[in-house]
Amino acid sequence: MKRYNVIFLLDPAGNRLLMCRRRKEPYQGLLNLVGGKIKDGEDHLCAAYRELSEETGIAERDVKLTRLMDFTYYQPDCLLEVYAGQLCRDVPVQGDENDLLWISIDEDFFDANRFAGDGNIGHIQVIAQYRAEHWRLAGTL
């Protein structure tokens, strides 16, 4: 089974989500979360930080990532791990593989004409908002 990760990353204010515009298939031209492949034998959290750094220039010291959820796809036999985090301070981002942009967290991420993943980013947003509210109410944030 192939393994991948994506990172649901908010700016310090929690108002904007970091996305990339895909330059290649699948979902060429659509907005997607940053992420990539998990190497064989690689610690999964380390892989998320590595991909974040490679694709955006954001260092581990700038954000604490938490594994939020997974998607298992039986065709084409892959696992997609979803990590979430919020930058602790403003940092510059730069992407070599894809163009990066910050967009409002209030977008309709279920819009398959704009966003990759056939609605999965919308599901990720709903779960991330629920978890954040739950953690606030529990006093763990």
What does each model-identified segment do?
Residues 1-17, 34:
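Conserved N-terminal beta-strand and adjoining loop/helix that marks the start
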Residues 11-15, 23, 86-91, 105-107:
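Short loop segments at secondary-structure junctions
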Residues 16-54:
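Conserved Nudix-box catalytic region and its N-terminal flanking loop in Nudix hydrolases
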Residues 19, 80-84, 102:
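Conserved hydrophobic/aromatic beta-strand scaffold that supports enzyme active sites
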Residues 26, 30-31, 94-141:
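Nudix hydrolase/Nudix homology domain
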Residues 45, 76-77, 120-124:
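A structural signal for well-ordered alpha-helical scaffolds and beta->alpha junctions
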Residues 57-91:
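Active-site segment of metal-dependent pyrophosphate-handling enzymes
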